[in-house]
């Protein structure tokens, strides 16, 4: 009996490594730029990293709404030999909460990026023809077609989303009631 238990335990110890995924935590940014950073720090880091093609304050815009700033960079126009194309850095209350990196499709294909992300971070939490999404408590990272990588600070995004909720129209409420009755 003891030999059987020992054999089962040994088998379990040997088989577990084959089924456990050795993945990294989802990153909260790229190229030294991370979600939650203040505006001035992001500007400084963008200046130091030529891969993004940042040209200084002329790339900074104010967005409609309260406390919203956008930095838009263009690595292709910056004559930088980059794997990146246009990148967007969106701020709320002076802190970075969305990073969108458009990847140069002439240099990298969608499948290569998807395969690399799966190997590093495991399988996506959700998958559709349009996008693949990886999530943890603080960050959502999505790979979207044609070839964009997006990082979102979940807490800030949810806060802004709840502030902007518009009541449903009568048609929407009726539709919901119909669907609930099915």
Q: Residues of each region from the PLM?
A:
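Sequence-pattern detector for short linear motifs
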Residues: 5-6, 46, 71, 178
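Sec-dependent N-terminal signal peptides
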Residues: 5-14
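C-terminal segment of classical bacterial N-terminal signal peptides
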Residues: 15-19
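Non-cytosolic coordination micro-motifs
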Residues: 21-66, 93, 98-182
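A low-complexity, Ser/Thr/Gly/Pro-enriched, surface-exposed linker/loop concept
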Residues: 60-78
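A glycine-rich, hydrophobic loop/mini-helix early in the fold
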Residues: 79-84
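Hydrophobic/aromatic beta-strand elements that line small-molecule binding cavities or substrate pockets
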Residues: 85-90
